[in-house]
Regions:
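Short, internal strand/loop/helix patches
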Residues: 319-353
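Short active-site neighborhood of thiol/selenol oxidoreductases, capturing the structured segment around
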Residues: 264-294, 307
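Alpha-helical repeat scaffolds
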Residues: 113-132, 176-185, 214-224, 232, ...
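N-terminal "domain-start" segment that seeds a small globular fold
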Residues: 232-267
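N-terminal, charged low-complexity regulatory/assembly segments
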Residues: 48-179, 183
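Charge-dense, extended regions
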Residues: 169-200, 204, 208, 212-241, ...
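Thiol-/selenol-based redox modules, centered on thioredoxin-like
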Residues: 352-378
Length: 378
């Protein structure tokens, strides 16, 4: 939602068809309605780019240039009909229209490699990136606006690949993460934006790996480059949490509370079973995603019991559509708090004899599958 002084917005929507039905009315409505149109158009273009990403560079960039020209026509038409429009909204609208295309152009090399038979990057000449001449990567006011931040993220990854890294297949190497952090430090000027990208990178790469093995060099680089005490403290908590549950050691018992509000022992709940303990909070995962993901994992790996444990939860906050008997929460007195100081979600995989097989897996990462497969078969 875009608001300026004296705006007064009302919105209407149908919850069964959320995005397509969202309409604004009132002062400032036209601005927000065209931004919604940009979002919906971008959703359609995502599907088209699955095909475009397989094209040779010349044909791909021709598609991008053609679509960009249409976006600029839309932009010019809007300004012609709104001659008194503010410069601030003009910048937002131009970003909403064009930056998703620029972001896809930045991501094209890795997507092309993914679909090509050789698995290699395409050969690109310098003119491929001519659109960069129209872009500033240090617009601090836009850094949390998704069309802009996604472009910057893709650009930073592209610049890091250009240092000679091969296409990433599953997990980012320690060296790639290290170099990406250095690229962020070099390219991003604003301290707040730089710190945000540094933290997002080191944490997301650790989670993507979905392993309790810590790569020291990227974390050391993060601590060297970040100037945010708050971010440093949080990342250190994640590191400490990871070290607190050790692979190939027996899971330490801790108390959980069920939804009859009774205190239970986790080792008794999972005794003799292969188990995935998923610690969650609503800041990171919505309930509908958790329900869908648990159902998918249960169907794929049926020999595992899936236990959901809400961090700092309460007995009223159940997740619908999954078995309430496997849902628990912990309060501030639970022994589990010793390895959840960051309050970040995590999965702990435990085998039938109570031994930890993975102490810090990511619920949403594709890379958790290899660990679940082994656990399911033993």
């Amino acid at each position: 939602i875009y608001l300026e002084p004296k705006d007064s917005l009302m919105l209407r929507l149908n919850t069964w068809d959320f995005d397509e039905s969202l309409v604004f009315a009132g002062v400032g409505a036209e601005r927000n309605n065209i931004l919604i149109d940009c979002f919906l158009e971008d959703e359609k273009e995502k599907k088209a780019f699955f095909t475009y990403n397989k094209l040779k560079p010349e044909k791909f960039i021709h598609k991008v240039d053609s679509l960009t020209a249409l976006k600029f026509k839309t932009f010019e038409h809007y300004l012609e009909n709104h001659p008194k429009e503010t410069a601030g909204f003009g910048e937002i609208l131009k970003t909403a229209l064009t930056y998703p295309l620029y972001a896809r152009a930045e991501k094209y090399p890795i997507m092309y490699a993914k679909f090509s038979k050789t698995g290699s990057f395409p050969d690109l000449d310098a003119s491929f990136f001519n659109y960069r001449n129209n872009i500033s990567i240090n617009k601090d006011a836009l850094i949390y606006y998704p069309p802009y931040s996604q472009y910057i993220r893709n650009y930073l990854y592209n610049e890091t690949y250009a240092l000679g890294h091969p296409p990433v297949k599953k997990t980012y190497s320690s060296k790639f993460t290290f170099d990406l952090l250095s690229t962020i430090d070099k390219k991003i000027v604003n301290k707040k934006s730089k710190n945000a990208f540094l933290k997002q990178t080191v944490v997301s790469h650790f989670y993507n790996k979905s392993s309790c093995v810590l790569n020291k060099k990227p974390f050391d680089k993060f601590f060297e480059l970040s100037t945010s005490p708050k971010d440093k403290k949080h990342v250190q908590q994640i590191i400490n949490d990871s070290k607190a549950v050790v692979k190939n050691q027996m899971i330490k018992d801790f108390s959980v509370i069920d939804y009859a509000n009774s205190t239970r022992s986790i080792t008794e709940i999972i005794k003799g079973k292969n188990a995935m303990l998923f610690f969650w909070n609503q800041e990171y995962y919505p309930k509908n995603y958790i329900a869908s993901r648990i159902k998918q994992l249960s169907n794929t790996y049926p020999n595992i019991i899936y236990i959901q444990i809400e961090i700092d939860g309460n007995y009223k906050n159940t997740i619908k559509k999954i078995d309430v008997k496997n849902q628990f929460f912990i309060d501030k007195n639970s022994e589990a708090q010793t390895f959840l100081t960051s309050k970040m979600p995590r999965c702990i995989l435990v085998n039938k004899i109570g031994k930890v097989t993975n102490g810090y897996a990511s619920f949403s990462s594709y890379n958790i599958n290899q660990y679940l497969k082994v656990l399911n078969e033993n």
